[in-house]
Amino acid sequence: MGTVHLIDHPLVQHKLTMMRRKDASTNSFRRLANEISALMTYEVLRDIPMQEIEIETPLEVTTGRVIDGKKLVFVSILRAGTGILDGMLTIVPGARVGHIGLYRDPRTLVAVEYYFKMPGDLHERDVVVVDPLLATGNSAVAAVERLKECGPKSIKFVCLLTCPEGVAALDKAHPDVPIYTAAVDRQLDEHGYILPGIGDAGDRIFGTK
């Protein structure tokens, strides 16, 4: 069984509530998405491997801890994933970035891949997949399956909110992939949207219809 990490810090929950409002402007929605993802990054990377190195301060030589190995790859599921990518890169600016282009067929709700670009040494890195919503789970399942073909050291999935159906779908296909989210909402509607949700994250981030 996979693990769902619910990040319920007061700042995260406050900002998520502001995002949910239907009268939130594109600018406000985008800013809040970045702020929430930045705050969530602390918890997502809590168990990242560390190593000790020797450094020199203005007063003496000492040791300190830094992130070990070749670090991270943030993988954005296009297009909405880019809306929370910047917030995470604010915290880890040295991370590599990959992109998976997926669109949801409006009739079948099946994820269709149209783009895939990753660092060449993905097998030496830890991957954090980012997408604002884990709804039907079809895109997440397809993205993780594709990434596993490259053999990364580990994979985590980060979203602003999800629902029981999305959690169940990703857990059934990839029980080894932990999910980090700010909320688990009630359910999906007949069109595959999360209720009460935040609407179409991509449209609200980019100001499109």
Swiss-Prot record:
Question: Which cofactors does it use?
Answer: Mg(2+)
MF terms (GO), sorted A to Z: GTP binding; magnesium ion binding; uracil phosphoribosyltransferase activity
The EC category is: transferase
Which keywords describe this protein according to UniProt? Allosteric enzyme, Glycosyltransferase, GTP-binding, Magnesium, Nucleotide-binding, Transferase
What GO biological process terms does the UniProt entry carry, in alphabetical order? UMP salvage; uracil salvage
Enzyme Commission number(s) from the entry:
2.4.2.9
The cofactor note from the UniProt entry for this protein is:
Binds 1 Mg(2+) ion per subunit. The magnesium is bound as Mg-PRPP.
Short name of one Pfam family: UPRTase
Please write the reaction equations for the catalytic activity of this protein.
Answer: UMP + diphosphate = 5-phospho-alpha-D-ribose 1-diphosphate + uracil
Q: Which family does it belong to?
A: Belongs to the UPRTase family.
Identify the PANTHER family for this entry.
ADENINE PHOSPHORIBOSYLTRANSFERASE, URACIL PHOSPHORIBOSYLTRANSFERASE, CHLOROPLASTIC
What protein is this chain from? Uracil phosphoribosyltransferase
| Gene name of the encoded protein | upp
